[in-house]
Amino acid sequence: MGAGNQQERLSGEESKRWFLAGLIEGEGSVCISIKTHGTARFGYYVDPEFFIYQHRTRRSVLELAQEVFQTGWIKPKHGNPDVLVYGITSRRTITEKIIPFLKRYMTYSARSADFERFARAVELFEAKAHQTAEGMVQIVRLAYQMNHDGKQRKRPLEEVLDRILRGHTPDTPGPQG
């Protein structure tokens, strides 16, 4: 086993993990979803999410992710049944499995800034920062800085922040006096 073939030194499990890291780099997504909800404290459900996308003929690759992380679901992508999605939306699993994986195996990622913001947002969730308006604002700002500065978000950042900061009062005008 010479220096010419260093891959021989990786165990089978370690090889799977490095392969999975490359897959996540190209086909993976970390995000903080922000969904309007009338009964949520600040008007939104805000949650970390992790996904990997593959054509349905490559399901085995998603099953590898399921094997490595020992959790997650696989289902067709909404609106495109030829694409399958492997997903983890459990905050605990993201904290215990995904973040440590990203820190260990995604060290040279072109998307490392997004991964760092994602990890920071998850840390804020773990510290229960999302239970205060100030903490929720921090998390939402991180979310909008991720993935090309939130360009594909449904709502502008200021609209979301305004709703959080006003304490989620109803969107309807009050009685006229």
Summary of predicted features, one role per range:
Residues 1-177:
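Sequence-level preference for short, compositionally simple segments enriched
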